Amino acid sequence: MKRTFQPSNRKRKNKHGFRERMASANGRRVLAARRAKGRKKLTVSDEYNGQKW
């Protein structure tokens, strides 16, 4: 049986990246909460900053 987690950086960024979070009110709320908590990485996009993926 195939495992359920088949990692893909492209899908990961498209679903959980910064621009996707900013696209909806709830996503912006997620970012605000993570900022308030003092998270170093707000989104998965922060792992790549500037690199090609």
Curated annotation (Swiss-Prot):
Disulfide bonds: none annotated. GO terms for cellular component: ribonucleoprotein complex; ribosome. Keywords: Ribonucleoprotein, Ribosomal protein. GO terms for molecular function: structural constituent of ribosome. Residues 1-16, 31-42 have a biased composition (Basic residues). It holds the Pfam family Ribosomal_L34. Residues 1-53 are annotated as: Disordered. PROSITE patterns: RIBOSOMAL_L34. GO terms for biological process: translation. InterPro entries: Ribosomal_bL34, Ribosomal_bL34_CS. Belongs to the bacterial ribosomal protein bL34 family. HAMAP family: Ribosomal_bL34. This is Large ribosomal subunit protein bL34. It comes from Bacteroides thetaiotaomicron (strain ATCC 29148 / DSM 2079 / JCM 5827 / CCUG 10774 / NCTC 10582 / VPI-5482 / E50).
